[in-house]
């Protein structure tokens, strides 16, 4: 499955440009692979029509809350519609971006499982070290108590 982000390279709307940049920045920061489709390039009319026909959210902005056609950025997983900027931003905020983008669970959990196992192994090693140190201290403290008691007994005899 290929994540596609439909953008407009020639938009005069600053809010649309900022939204496009934010979507791409978030995807890059989360190492999510995607293809950018610039609907304003010559020969991309079919992609523009696909975006406009399959988008269920119009991506309204402050300056144009009810646009006639969906505004970029619009996100698709292959040809399956994921959502517009507002839905993307909300999914990012509540940490459900992978579900929103309809990414395969194996793609995102493989790394997470490996990291969790590594942390558990490291945690077990640290736990064993701490237990060993605690036993050593108990042994040392125990020997020290015997010496203190013997010294006290010797002083009492004198």
From Swiss-Prot:
Motif SH3-binding in this chain: 67-73
Keywords carried by this UniProt record: Phosphoprotein, SH3-binding
GO cellular component: cytoplasm
Keyword Phosphoprotein listed: yes
Compositionally biased intervals (Basic and acidic residues): 40-51
UniProt-listed Pfam families: SH3BGR
Domain of life of the native organism: Eukaryota
The keyword Cell membrane belongs to this UniProt entry's keyword annotation: no
Phosphothreonine: residues bearing it: 109
InterPro entries assigned: Glut_rich_SH3-bd, SH3BGR, Thioredoxin-like_sf
Biased composition (Polar residues): 52-61
UniProt GO molecular function: SH3 domain binding
Disordered as annotated region, ranges: 40-74, 118-158
PANTHER family the record matches: SH3 DOMAIN-BINDING GLUTAMIC ACID-RICH PROTEIN HOMOLOG (PTHR12232:SF15), SH3 DOMAIN-BINDING GLUTAMIC ACID-RICH-LIKE PROTEIN (PTHR12232)
Family label: Belongs to the SH3BGR family.
Protein name (database record): SH3 domain-binding glutamic acid-rich protein homolog
Organism: Drosophila melanogaster
């Amino acid at each position: 499955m290929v994540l596609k982000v439909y953008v407009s390279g020639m938009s005069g709307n600053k809010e649309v440009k900022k939204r496009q940049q934010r979507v791409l920045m978030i995807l890059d920061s989360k190492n999510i692979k995607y293809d950018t489709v610039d609907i304003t390039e010559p020969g991309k009319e079919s992609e523009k029509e696909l975006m406009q026909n399959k988008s269920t959210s119009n991506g309204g902005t402050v300056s144009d809350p009810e646009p006639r056609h969906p505004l970029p950025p619009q996100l698709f997983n292959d040809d399956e519609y994921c959502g517009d900027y507002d839905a993307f931003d909300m999914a990012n905020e509540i940490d459900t971006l992978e579900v929103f983008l309809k990414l395969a669970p194996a793609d995102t959990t493989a790394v997470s499982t490996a990291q969790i196992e590594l942390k558990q192994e490291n945690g077990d090693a640290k736990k064993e070290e701490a237990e060993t140190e605690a036993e050593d201290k108990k042994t040392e403290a125990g020997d020290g108590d015997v010496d203190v008691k013997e010294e006290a007994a010797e002083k009492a005899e004198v």
